[in-house]
């Protein structure tokens, strides 16, 4: 199961910041979910909210600040302690930082149509110029935006972000031609996951922070989880995989030891005994 770092590594570092992505990257994370908003000067920047209030010491809408002004803010306000000031980066800065990311979910929040139109153009241009068709999907809970970006380039992969079971988000995703179904983990069922797969969609679920829930979702057949703690989550699944790989060897060693013990005690199979 694929592990996406939520806003970089929201539970481990300042969200949607370069140091947060770098932190997760150094621990082996190559899949990220992040949020894209348009700055005052028309540049896609990485921030979850349409305002800067929650994550910085500043106030007001992201649209009221240039990318340079956003970069100069301190985006540590809503996170655990972090030793150095970190600003709000641009999408291009993130893409320049890494050349081997495997996949990005670029989420776009509902906003004014005029701004979304501009952001749609900017994202299309970035994906085309950097050839991110296979390595990025544009996701949103706004069907209008998903239709618009697909209208600009039918090869851009899209995903519907679904928080509730109604009004039938999987049917909406199907009508939009989405390749990704990005659902709140609490609304998923095996039937829903199976149906999404039959319709050719990758099922990604958010925000999953407990191992118990991750394992249940794995049983449902989800393709990926989005978590605030990607490095510890990745460590858990890597350790489990290594343990499973070592299991046959351990069983073989134990079997050999038991056979040797039986031989030492004079135990042997008589003719006619044993497996048929």
State the predicted function of each range.
Residues 1-276:
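Phosphate-group recognition and catalysis centered on beta-loop-alpha active-site segments
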